[in-house]
Amino acid sequence: MTNIRKSHPLFKIINDSLIDLPAPSNISSWWNFGSLLGICLAIQILTGLFLAMHYTSDTTTAFQSVTHICRDVNYGWILRYLHANGASMFFICLFLHVGRGLYYGSYMYKETWNVGVILLFAVMATAFMGYVLPWGQMSFWGATVITNLLSAIPYIGTDLVEWIWGGFSVDKATLTRFFAFHFLLPFIISALVLVHLLFLHETGSNNPTGIPSDSDMIPFHPYYTIKDMLGALVMILALLMLVLFSPDLLGDPDNYTPANPLNTPPHIKPEWYFLFAYAILRSIPNKLGGVLALVLSILILILMPLLHTSKQRSMMFRPLSQCMFWLLVADLLTLTWIGGQPVEHPFIIIGQLASILYFLIILVLMPITSIVENHLLKW
């Protein structure tokens, strides 16, 4: 008699995805972030669900309801801070996951990669709408500034913004619909994650060398289940350290002031994980140009398979490309720093140079470096 996990229609899917899945024998800890992202998503959905039971999406009571959660609901404070800092953890894992994909050439699995880019956009949209819900000063002004960017779209821009707002400014209708979408999107993300995994399991995982590993595979369980459990333990420990010791470290003090449409905060800035894109947006004096650069800064990831000019898939044996990759990482860290600074000299010019360098590295320097390395192989 065959094992039930191999014969039962439902268990068979789980078995083929998590137990008997053939995996390369040499994948490093950089391959842990997929499972960590799954755990982050589960934490966010669970904490979000319990928060939604006590939250009210009305402009008059939203801020008060968040205060009520923190003060009066049993363990409400830990739910709130797990959810807020869980988002930061989510983005740390996301950036490392994407960085791993860029470094080791995982983008050559085009379907998996493209679904991943869509997932990135969906998570960013969800995080943005979630930031609006506490209805603090930065929530309100962040929502106003970012939604207002759509008015740069020619002809339909203004109508589009007012349609999203549900009026002539960010108000009750906006908050209610943002709550509805913020609740809905994680479930759409969960469905997309399954599609992402479906495409991944069609090809199997890549590995650090970038060489096909069909001849050297091991079962996912117990080798990678135990490895993923260790990764999860480290991440959850880091998250709990953040939540229990410095829960407001990554937040903005302005968001502890209730939203006031008559008083603009001196420095409007998004959460830290959007600062790199915000810096690119601000570095272009033209509104439409800024919006296009903002969207393209993420959308450019879709072009990665087309920009791959190397004869090798991974950067493991390509020292010049490695230099370009780490230059890109340094550039993104610079942009993140600039995004949190006021718009004044010397930050303006640093932001503009870093923005130009960002697109230059991806579109020009990396492909050229790869071609040079191809020629060096012949020596």
Swiss-Prot record:
CDD domains, A to Z: cytochrome_b_C, Cytochrome_b_N
Xref: SUPFAM superfamilies: a domain/subunit of cytochrome bc1 complex (Ubiquinol-cytochrome c reductase) (SSF81648), Transmembrane di-heme cytochromes (SSF81342)
Presence of the UniProt keyword Calcium in the record: no
Recorded GO CC terms: mitochondrial inner membrane; respiratory chain complex III
Pfam family, one: Cytochrom_B_C
Location within or outside the cell: Mitochondrion inner membrane
InterPro entries membership: Cyt_b/b6_C, Cyt_b/b6_C_sf, Cyt_b/b6_N, Cytb/b6-like_sf, Cytochrome_b, Cytochrome_b_C_euk/bac, Cytochrome_b_N_euk/bac, Di-haem_cyt_TM
Binding positions for heme b b566 per the UniProt entry: 97, 196
The record's free-text note on cofactor binding: Binds 2 heme b groups non-covalently.
Binding residue positions for a ubiquinone: 201
Alphabetically ordered keywords of this record: Electron transport, Heme, Iron, Membrane, Metal-binding, Mitochondrion, Mitochondrion inner membrane, Respiratory chain, Transmembrane, Transmembrane helix, Transport, Ubiquinone
Superkingdom field: Eukaryota
Family statement: Belongs to the cytochrome b family.
Quaternary assembly: The cytochrome bc1 complex contains 11 subunits: 3 respiratory subunits (MT-CYB, CYC1 and UQCRFS1), 2 core proteins (UQCRC1 and UQCRC2) and 6 low-molecular weight proteins (UQCRH/QCR6, UQCRB/QCR7, UQCRQ/QCR8, UQCR10/QCR9, UQCR11/QCR10 and a cleavage product of UQCRFS1). This cytochrome bc1 complex then forms a dimer.
Summary of the function given for this chain in its UniProt record: Component of the ubiquinol-cytochrome c reductase complex (complex III or cytochrome b-c1 complex) that is part of the mitochondrial respiratory chain. The b-c1 complex mediates electron transfer from ubiquinol to cytochrome c. Contributes to the generation of a proton gradient across the mitochondrial membrane that is then used for ATP synthesis.
Protein name stated in the entry: Cytochrome b
